[in-house]
């Protein structure tokens, strides 16, 4: 079981193509947690490459924040690909997107997303979201270690 200790930062992989949203998310986590590191990639293909590069060391991120509408490999396709990789099936994925479309929500959960959140409208709401993610996914939830 994965536990977070003060000496080991929590690593979040953020898949986000909008630089403004990426900055807001990273800044929000910086404000709420000293021990959370956000690494940003701008599309689904880059996310798969990042995860593939980390396969040899087994140093996968602790959490993946995923915008659905990213270029090259759509977020839903990325979710499906994660389930095809045995080492990645336990990686917690939170979809963080502007879409409130019922089919996007249903398809995300069908493809094993752990949560579906709609992006906030302002900085303070991003900070509240980061605090909630940190408190639940980083500090409270008991998660399996990567295979």
Model-derived segments and their meaning:
Residues 66-68, 97:
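Active-site residues of response regulator receiver
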Residues 17, 96-100, 120:
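Conserved active-site segment of CheY-like receiver
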Residues 71, 101:
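The feature encodes the CheY-like receiver
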Residues 1-13, 17-34, 124-147:
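Non-catalytic signal-transmission and effector/linker regions of two-component phosphorelay proteins
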Residues 40-63:
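Acidic, metal-coordinating helix/loop segments flanking the phosphotransfer/catalytic sites
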Residues 59-62, 87-92:
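His-Asp phosphorelay/catalytic-motif detector in bacterial-type signaling
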């Amino acid at each position: 079981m994965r536990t977070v200790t003060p000496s080991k930062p929590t690593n979040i992989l953020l898949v986000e193509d909008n630089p403004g949203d990426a900055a807001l998310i990273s800044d929000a986590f910086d404000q709420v947690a000293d021990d959370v590191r956000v690494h940003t990639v701008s599309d689904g293909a880059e996310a798969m490459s990042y995860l593939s590069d980390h396969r040899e060391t087994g140093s996968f991120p602790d959490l993946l924040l995923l915008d659905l509408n990213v270029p090259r490999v759509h977020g839903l396709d990325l979710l499906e690909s994660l389930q095809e990789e045995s080492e990645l099936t336990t990686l917690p994925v939170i979809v963080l997107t502007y879409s409130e479309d019922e089919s996007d929500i249903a398809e995300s959960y069908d493809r094993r997303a752990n949560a579906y959140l709609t992006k906030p409208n302002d900085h303070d709401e991003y900070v509240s979201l980061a605090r909630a993610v940190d408190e639940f996914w980083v500090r409270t939830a008991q998660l399996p270690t990567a295979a």
